[in-house]
């Protein structure tokens, strides 16, 4: 296993996981707010 796929000391899979989780959380909060009725105020 080589280390060429990493940027600095942070593995790409960790960056992807964190970014994906944050994106899913934002989408979930947005749809939840829209469902409850607070989405129009964002």
UniProtKB/Swiss-Prot annotation:
The coiled-coil segments of this chain are: none
Q: Where on the tree of life does the source sit, at the highest rank?
A: Eukaryota
* Functional note: One of the components of the core complex of photosystem II (PSII). PSII is a light-driven water:plastoquinone oxidoreductase that uses light energy to abstract electrons from H(2)O, generating O(2) and a proton gradient subsequently used for ATP formation. It consists of a core antenna complex that captures photons, and an electron transfer chain that converts photonic excitation into a charge separation.
Report quaternary structure and partners: PSII is composed of 1 copy each of membrane proteins PsbA, PsbB, PsbC, PsbD, PsbE, PsbF, PsbH, PsbI, PsbJ, PsbK, PsbL, PsbM, PsbT, PsbX, PsbY, PsbZ, Psb30/Ycf12, at least 3 peripheral proteins of the oxygen-evolving complex and a large number of cofactors. It forms dimeric complexes.
The molecule here is called: Photosystem II reaction center protein J
Q: Which SUPFAM superfamilies match?
A: Photosystem II reaction center protein J, PsbJ
One GO cellular-component annotation of the UniProt record comes to: photosystem II reaction center
The record's similarity note reads: Belongs to the PsbJ family.
**Can you say where in the cell this protein is located?**
Plastid, Chloroplast thylakoid membrane
Q: Name the UniProt key words of this record, in alphabetical order.
A: Chloroplast, Membrane, Photosynthesis, Photosystem II, Plastid, Reaction center, Thylakoid, Transmembrane, Transmembrane helix
Against Pfam families, the record matches this protein to:
PsbJ
- Membrane-crossing ranges are 10-30
Q: How does it sit in the membrane?
A: Single-pass membrane protein
- The reply on keyword Thylakoid is yes
Query: Which NCBIfam families does the record cross-reference, listed alphabetically?
Result: PRK02565.1
Which InterPro entries does its entry note?
A: PSII_PsbJ (IPR002682), PSII_PsbJ_sf (IPR037267)
Gene3D superfamilies from the xrefs? 6.10.250.2070
One GO biological process from the UniProt record? Answer: photosynthesis
